[in-house]
Each structure stands twice: as structure tokens, then as C-alpha cells.
Amino acid sequence: FRIVSENVRLKAFDQCGIDAASPYYVKVGRGHAQHKRYMLLFTCLQYRCVHLELLSSLDTCSFLLAFERFIARRVKPSRCVTDNGLNFRGGEKELREIWNRFDHEQIREKHSSIEWWFNPPASPSMGGVFEIMVKCCKRAVTTIIPNHTLTEEELSTAFAMAENIVNSRPISYISNDVGDLE
């Protein structure tokens, strides 16, 4: 589907794809207890830049908190495209209910304009853009921390480093020819 026309320039993350990636194991406390943590990926659908958040679980509450962190750090998107995960469906529903409860017009205007698009169930290929970015980010994280169990802070730092690596890549072909200026 076509996101925007050629003449319209949007700010980064105005339209984003959201996906959660496979678990990473972290050490908690002084013992040897390991807990699962997940990577939540926000992909800008226009510029292909990424934002990574650490999820403590795949429940709706964890997603909503990560989504609020994303909005606080980046921008409130006008459109979110995601798969049919229960945490995303529940998150969208809870956000709508919470925003409708407030009587303050400012708060309602701030968040109610987000349009949610869900890919059809059981079709991960429909989220091609952000599925490819998940692959890039997972590869970057694996390069940074191969087969190590980290603390949550170390994993969060690894996510920030991976985000930097992925966002630093060229988005178009770079020629090796010095005379080629295009």
C-alpha cells in the first residue's frame, strides 16, 4: 500500500510499524535467575529509521508503557501499523478507553488521533518493512552481545547501540566512483 505521495514530507515516525521480537534472557538480582525480556521495534515507514524499547513481558500493560516512552522520546505517530498480536490489539483498545474517559480536551486531542492498522491474522509477510528491520536489529544485537546473559541495563544499552548501528546505515546506493556525484 502507498503510505504518502511523493510531494508530501512527513516527520520521522509519523507513520510507524510496530513489532515485538524474540526473547532475550537477562540476569535479575544476585542469583542466577534468568528472566525473558523482549525487543519492541518501532520502524518509521517513510525513512526506515528504528527505535528500540525493552519490554519486560508481552502483556498489554508493558506495551502501553513502552509506547508512552516512545511518544515521550520521539513523536506521537498519526498511524501505527502492526501485526495482530494480542498485546497490540489490547493496547489499542485500552488506549481508546482511557482517552475517552478523560474530559480534558487537550489530552483527548493529544492521543486520540492515532490511527491503528492491523495486518491480517497469521500473515507475518504483510509487515515486510518492519519484519526486515527486526532482522537487522536482531543481527546488530547479536553482533554486540553474542551468547551472553546480561543485566537489564546492559541489554537496554545493547539495544541503544543496535539502534545507532541500524540508523547509521545508508538508505540508498553509495557509488565507489569518485566522479559519480549522483
Predicted regions and their residues:
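Retroviral integrase
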Residues: 1-135, 139
